[in-house]
């Protein structure tokens, strides 16, 4: 099972090298790696060229969604995986993913990897706070013995969908550039196409250093929550809680169902509608 892996990057060469190392050493199939290099003056453009990877390039930082739009033009495989450039993939990650996809036997799914990190994540386990002190052996050993269950998936990378589904919803929405809110928007578009399997595969682990790009001082984020609210009538938190049923780290319990009406649902939707109309008139 070969994947097309989309990787946007913005001057994170040391993390990028670590990501590429993990995909090279820990994969079992010949995946198609497609990078979009924003700027690349830190040496990342030269690195990708020297490694003969497929890539697109922009002189300036064009934002996450536009980066993915450019890279996705080169997709050739049936499954599309999106990942951050500051992640390290565990051994045999693609075997675990392949086994799960084979169980489903249809195209209507959203599967994600379980993020391991020293801070907020599915699994809290400190293997280092940066590429400089990352303990690969500690992470590998942890992956071998950890028996965490599969989780209800939220809208976090890395995630994989079928190419037909990716094309049907047109990938990430450009109106969410430079990127905040693009992940829940992508999942909402999948929901509207009747995807109900949103599952995080615990054995498919990545170590995440915590959104290195968005922590840069020169990155100005868009108001993704507001954009999402104006587009759908409720915010991403409401979507996670009542649609994905994943407001927190929760054990997977099967395909999600339609939102269930309750008193808390009523209160939350009223609050969201009030915010919606406030944003519309301001």
Residue locations for each model-derived region?
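Conserved donor NDP-sugar-binding/catalytic core segment of glycosyltransferases
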Residues: 91-130
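Cell-envelope/extracellular polymer assembly enzymes that use nucleotide-activated donors
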Residues: 2-4, 32, 185
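A conserved acidic beta->alpha catalytic loop
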Residues: 29, 37-46
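A short, conserved alpha-helix in the catalytic core of glycosyltransferases
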Residues: 152-170, 176-204
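C-terminal, non-catalytic tails of nucleotide-sugar-dependent glycosyltransferases
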Residues: 110, 120-123, 128-151, 155-160, ...
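Short, acidic, metal-binding catalytic loop of nucleotide-sugar glycosyltransferases
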Residues: 21-30
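Glycine-rich, basic loop-to-helix element that forms the pyrophosphate-binding segment
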Residues: 58-75
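Short aromatic/hydrophobic "clamp" motif used to bind/position activated sugar donors
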Residues: 80
